[in-house]
Structure formats: C-alpha cells, structure tokens
Amino acid sequence: MSNKYKDTLLIGKTDFDMRANLNQKEPKFEQFWQENQIYNKKLKLNENKKVFVLHDGPPYANGDLHIGHALNKTLKDFIIRFKNTTGYYAPFIMGWDTHGLPIESAVTKMGVDRKSMSSVAFRELCYKYALEQVSNQANQFNRLGMFTDYDTKYVTLTHDFEMSELRLFEKMYQKGLIYKDLKPIYWSPSSESALADSEIIYKDISSPSIYVGCDVINSDEFKNTQLIIWTTTPWTLPSNQLIAIGSKIKYSLIQVENSDKQFILASDLINQVSQNIGWENVKVIKEIDANKLVGLNYVHPLYDTKISKVVLGHHVTSESGSGLVHIASGFGEDDFLIAKQNNIKPFAPIDNQGKFTTQISDLDPQLVGMFYDDTNKIITKRLEENKKLLKLKFLTHSYPHDWRTKKPVIYRCTLQWFVNLAPVKNDILKNVDQINTHPKWAKKRLYQVLDERTDWTISRQRLWGVPIIAFYDQNDDLVLNEQILNYAINKIEEVGTNAWFSLDADEFLPEQYKNKSLKKEKDILDVWFDSGSSAIALSQKYPNLKLPYDMYLEGNDQYRGWFNASMINSTIYSNTSPYKQLVSHGMTTDEKGNKMSKSLGNGVDPIAFANDLGADILRLWVASTDFTDDQKIGKEIIKQISESYRKIRNTIRFILANLNDFNVKTDYQTKLSEVDMYSLFNLTSFKNKVIQAYQELNFSLVYTLVMNYVTKNLSAFYLDFIKDILYINSKNDLRRRQVQTVLYEQLYCLIDVLRPILVHTIEEVYQNLNDNNKVESVHLLDNKEQNFVYDKEFINKWDQVMILRDDVNKALEISRENKIINKGFEAVVNIKLDKEYDDLKNIKDLSQIFIVNSINFVDNIDNSFIKTNISSIKVEQKQGLKCQRCWQIFDNLIDDEICNHCNNVVKSLLETKCE
C-alpha cells in the first residue's frame, strides 16, 4: 500500500495488548476485585434471586496447593460464576479442614516436643499453624482467580463449628447410636491412631506367604497328623487361639511321599496346596466331614505348652489357602467374632506403635518391644526349626495403608468409639436414592459404599481435634448419660474445647457427679466427623442456606470420604441428604497417564504455573478436559491450550480495536444487512448451546464450542470479510456502523461465555471496551440478552450461502495451485448454480462476503468449470489496475491511483479536516 493513503485508513486501535503478560496483569485484577469487594457487590445485586449453594468440601490445611486442588476449586468457580450471571444468588463459602495428625506432625517437625508442654500449649501451636496454612492456601486460591470472600469462610477449628459438631455428637448419643466397645479396627502404627474405612488406601506390597502344620493331639483317629493353615502375616501366629473350618467344606486326610506326617486340608485345595508346597505323589487316605474336625485339639505351632482347638468359622471358604484358617482374635474382624462366639477373650499384644507388649512375655519374651513386621523372620525361622514350616515364599498383593502416611496398617483390637449405622442404614440409602449424580454411575457407587459400610469408628488417639465428651470412674468404667453430656457441652460452649484439656473433670459435670474422682475421655473425634459435619454447621451459621444443598463437587476418592461422612451425618441430624446433586471428578495425571509424584518429577505446581503462564491458561486447561475422567496435563497439552488462548485473545483484540470509535448510544444500528443478521443468528445459536453446556457441567463442550465459533464463524468468516468495510469506508458510513453493531454484540457474547473461565482476561477486555454503560467490573454483570431469531426460510437461505462459500473457497484454492490467481481479490468467479439454489443469485454483496473481485452467475458452462457441492465454478484473474488504497482491481482508477469509492472517502476526510 502506498504510504500516501495509509493514514486515511481506519485501522482500529486498542490498549488490549496482543501479548497477554498474564503473570503481570492477573495479580492486579485480583487485588482490584478484593479491594473493591466485587464478589460481595455481586451477591448484593443477586440477593433477591433464587439461592444456589455449591457446598465446598474443605481441603486439608497443610502445605501448598497441588494441581488437584486447582482443578477442584476451578470447576467449582466455573459453576459459581455462571450461576451468579444467570439468575441466581450463588455464594461461594470456602472451607478448610484443620484438625488431626498431619498438623500435629508438622508442628512436631518444627522442633516442638509435645511431651514437654501442656496439652493446651500444644493445641495452641497447632491452632496457630493451621490458621497460617489456611491463610497461605487462601492466598494461593486467590491467585487462581476464585470468586469468593476469603473473610467469609468456614474453618473446622472455629468455636461455632466445633460446637455444631458436638451438638451433632449429642444428637447421635440421644438416638442411641454412640457406643464404645472393644473391636478390631484399622490401626496405623505410623499415625499411632485408629483409622476409619475411608482413611484406607490400597497399595501392592510383598509379604511372606507361609503354610504351617499344627500337630493334632489327643486323637486316636488322627495320630501323627498336622492341620495345614496358611497366612501372609506370620507375626500374628504368636497370638493364635483357634483354627476355623467351614461347615459345608469337605476335608481330606492325605499322605505325602517321603513325609512321616499326615495332613488335613480342604479337598478342593489339595492340588493347589500340593503345587505351592512342591509335593508329589499325594495320596488321599479318606474324606472327612467338617463336623468330625470340630473340637479337635492341636498344639500351638510356636509354643508346645499351648493347646487350642478347631471350631467352625462363618468366613472360611475353599477358594484359597488350605480351607483351615488361623484365628487371632485381636487382629481380625472375623477372628474377633469367632473367638467371641467361643467365649475366648481378645488377645492383641501390640501397642500403639506396632510393637509387641509385655502381654506376650509369658509366651515369648524375645518379641517384647519388637516392631510387628520385624518379627516375621524370627517366627518363620522357628517354625522351620520346629518342622512346622511347610513352605515359605513371597507374594505381591494389595494391602491396606494409611492414606496420610502411606504406610501399612494392621487390624488391631482396641477400645474405640463407634456410630452404630444399622438403625439408620435404610434412611441413608433412601436419601442416596433421591439424589442426582454426575456422572450417572456415581449414585450406584455411593450406594454400594454406604450399603457395605460397617459401624463408623469415630475416635482417634490424638490431641489436636474436637474432644469426645465422656467420663470414667476409678475402675475405668464409662460414666455417661444424656444429662452429663448436655451439661458438659453447655460448659464447653462457654469456655471452648481447649478447656477440656486443662480443667478438672468436675468443671464439666452436674453437681451430683462432682467429687467422685471421675476422669475425662482423652480421645478426639475423627477428622471425617469434622468435615462430614460441615453442611450442618453452615446451615446453622447461615439460616438462608438451607439443607439439602444444591451440589457437592469433589474428586472421585470422596465416595468413601466426604460424600460418605456427610450423608451419614446429615441423615442422622435431619433425615435428609446434605446434597441434591453429587458431582465427582477424576484425578490429575501426566501426559502419559501416570499419577503425579515427587519421585517421578511429573507434578505441576499450580501457583508456579500461574506465575509463569497465567492462571487463565490453567483455567482454560481445566475447561478443556472431561473432568469426569482423569485429567492429563503436561508440556504438549499446555502448549495446545496456550495456542487456543492466543486465538481467543487475538480475536477479541480485533473486535476491541474496531469498536474504538463506536458509541453504542449513537452508532448502534437496528436495521442490518442480511449477512449481519445471519451472523447474529449464529451468535444466538452458539450462545444457547454454550449456556446449555454450562448447565450440564459440560465444560469441555463449552471449550470446543468456543474454539469452533472463534475460528470458523468469526475469524475465518465474518471478521475476515468485514475488514475492508471497517478500514476503507468512512468513519460514519452506515455499512461500517452496521458491522460495528454486530461486533459489539459478538464481543458481549464472548464476554458472557468466557467470563466464568478466563476471569482475568475478560476483566481486561471489559476495562478496554469503549462503552459508556460500563459498570465497575465485568463480574458485576449478568449475561446479556441476545435473542436474535429469524424465520427458517431466511436461515436456510444463508446456510446455502455458506455452502456456496465453501464451494468458492475450494475453487479458489485449486486456482491458486494452478497459478491462475495469487490472492482472492484478483478472482473473477463465474458460477453456475444447481437449479434448486437459483435464488442465491439475488444475495447482495456476495463478492465482498466471499472476498473476491467479482461474481458472475452464468447459465452455460464448459469443461473448464469445476463441479462442487451446489454449483459449478470457474475462476479467472481480473485484469486491470489495483487501487493504492483498498487494493481492489478496477478497469479504471482516478489519477491511476485510487478507485472512485476510495476517492470519495478521502475527499470527505479532507473536507472534515478543513472544517
């Protein structure tokens, strides 16, 4: 282009930079939102609208956020922002889980000696540390662009929350659901505490697998015979009390070549056991009915002085092992029940740290003080020396681990507090039946987990948590009733939970129970009891937020965790589900599908990511994934997302630049050309689909729809052909103002559909928009009503135009390849329409819309025409002179420089300057 005419073109200008520099701009917007209370102002605007509550599951307040936190909160933020712009009052009250072992451990690692200080002093350090962690995580969530007020949050360590929890405990007690009993439960030596089922994860480990022979005694029928048992926990053998058999299982007495012993095992397992041990030439002497084995005495495989017997066991099968099961009542749930049925007291000589206690000293003093797992070698060696070890090998199998420490747990019989779920199980399952879930299979999964759940172990042997309110006399017998419990909780309401750990028991007892030397319970409530009470606590603090809440949204690891505990607590408290809809998302993995771990070095730090590429890129990644499945993230994926972001940003930048001189009050046009109307129809269709996708939580579809619309409907079509109108026509030209009107609507459409996702970028867009009607922040707006609807005949016609456009583009591409033309504006396009599309001849400005020099509709064609979808096309090169201003080719130019249209525009510019 000649420099002579460059300044006469209306090239749009905007301060909305091509380079995003998100890491520099985003913190400024976050500060702006917080300082100006944008979230609270939006809630105020929405206060009379329908309430929508997405109840935030509390992350644990320990350490920095990981990518899973970012995924979870960003998904919630999408929903909260969308609801607040589409007719709802949707508060986002974020929560934190702040009690329990990890915080105790973190404080201890800071050099604090828990045993050298009072319980209250240690608890105060935990309290201080937890609040510091909450503050740190809140700042990090703020960096990711969450729409919330960080001063309006719930934290499980606050007095009001703890009291809500204790009142729930009281209600459970009043309903007869709370009890204390000696039971085998999951015990974590690494945490030194009981664990609930929800706190268990499974990992593969290698364990010793041993077959052991136990000598039968006092039997004429089974002389010189051993009962075969099998176990992967040799350390439990010192505690063996019984051998259990199945009542419906057939057993056999066998003779093995080169052995002076006979053996008894399940008939169905002879081949498997023989193969595992390495026996050959096994002879079945006779089959034995199970009842004949009941009461049979045997010598303990480790201690000759200990005699035990064979009993029936409900859990014994002939699918694996030997069909005879070693029973140690202190280390297994079924073992405990069988021992109880046979009037045998539980025996569990293992302490809180997993070490053998002096309870074993009479039988085996060598084991006292040893860690249970370290005794396996000693025990198997003794069995071998005593000729009781038939086979030792190692097998890899799935084994329960502590979900926090990632170390193995054991079943251990201890006195614990429980919630009896049997009386409320049907109510719980009925409530599950009434909820909606996303994905659909989630309801069945939650139902199954709750249906199979046994009584809830709610006590923990820790210090940092909500105390269990109970008392004991000098004989350690429990002293508790409704009067005592209510009095104690009322006292704690006055003085706080720390007082439970510092004041005498009498301070919490009614008058008639004082001065009786009663002792307080030392255990605290399970942290799942804490977080599972959150919906109740929130409903009490904010009466306008009524149960059940509209939605819970957490990772798919919460079916056994928060989803589960919340449903139990809410059902017991108010016989209602805490949520109407339950939504779960998958876990984050690297690009190869591997779980993220420090050892693999494949983790993604969301804050480092935001401070490098920008939080909006991370948020766009979240939107792009199918969150119901596991989400992959890595360099290549982020590269693709960044490219998508650039396309969106550049499209918006073009629109902003070309609205720079547009005043919506004076320049907005209601009468538009047909192509403008068609563009607005596509806008409405697109926006409706996006809104539906948001409503269905299909954010990946939102992402796909946006990218298709930006690239195909806007960049490759409408924005492409209107450039000449915007740049070349005069400023106040009607056609130019019509196009700008469409751009104005397109921009607001993009603002609405992208506002929940690209929260910083859309704020930047809005701040750079030339609009006299602007409010303080884009996040105070509701979605703009954009209902551009036209009759079907009109839409069908323009759908056909778009097909013809594709035909022309195909012909142009072939012509470029054949060197007929270089650019589209050189092309003279001759078109023979198929008969049913003849009406397209009447469309105005097709050459401008198709960005070609001219279009001729013809009736006759020859072999040089190319057959396309609805037409036959021939492209020729326009011969003539190129206008130095608009670059279009004409037969004649004024002064051999510019076309007539450009000349008129330039003249009007000169006249305006002179005025």
Swiss-Prot record:
GO CC entries: cytosol
Motif ('KMSKS' region): 595-599
UniProt binding sites for L-isoleucyl-5'-AMP: E554
Keywords: Aminoacyl-tRNA synthetase, ATP-binding, Cytoplasm, Ligase, Metal-binding, Nucleotide-binding, Protein biosynthesis, Zinc
Subcellular location(s) of the protein: Cytoplasm
One protein family per Pfam: Anticodon_1
Name under which the protein is recorded: Isoleucine--tRNA ligase
Biological source species: Mycoplasma mycoides subsp. mycoides SC (strain CCUG 32753 / NCTC 10114 / PG1)
Gene: ileS
